[in-house]
Amino acid sequence: MKVLLLLGFIFCSMAAHGKRMERCEFARRIKQLHLDGYHQISLANWVCLAQWESGFDTKATNYNPGDQSTDYGILQINSHYWCDDGKTPHAANECKVRCSELQEDDLVKAVNCAKKIVDQQGIRAWVAWRNKCEGKDLSKYLEGCHL
């Protein structure tokens, strides 16, 4: 009985966290989705951004009490501007997606929304990129990936 309870707890925890991608797996996937070089932003920049925004967790969420918004998914896309979570006041939903769709493991909607963000604001829209990636040697983020 205890084993069944423990297994249930483990599976519930896994479902809540979603898929934590490996660094190179993430790099390969977003390259397939043509994010590498988009607006001259290198693949290493995107990998660095995802590392510091979500730790490569597709289901990551972070609540921002100031504007009552939430950041969603592996790229931590914000509900105040970019998606609809049904609870953020005055949400713009510029990407025309439900925020939960930005947490899908295939990354298609997250990447499409990221392209829209870059079209409008550039990669500087992400605070973690400005703080952890901008102006740094990012070669380590693609090391060993054989892309």
From Swiss-Prot:
**Cystines in this chain:** C24-C145, C48-C133, C83-C99, C95-C113
One GO process term, biological-process aspect: defense response to Gram-positive bacterium
List the InterPro entries.
Answer: Glyco_hydro_22, Glyco_hydro_22_CS, Glyco_hydro_22_lys, Lysozyme-like_dom_sf
Give me the reactions it catalyses. Hydrolysis of (1->4)-beta-linkages between N-acetylmuramic acid and N-acetyl-D-glucosamine residues in a peptidoglycan and between N-acetyl-D-glucosamine residues in chitodextrins
Where do the C-type lysozyme domain residues begin and end?
19-147
Predominantly, its location class is secreted
Q: Give the quaternary structure.
A: Monomer.
- Role, per record: Lysozymes have primarily a bacteriolytic function; those in tissues and body fluids are associated with the monocyte-macrophage system and enhance the activity of immunoagents.
Q: What is this protein called?
A: Lysozyme C
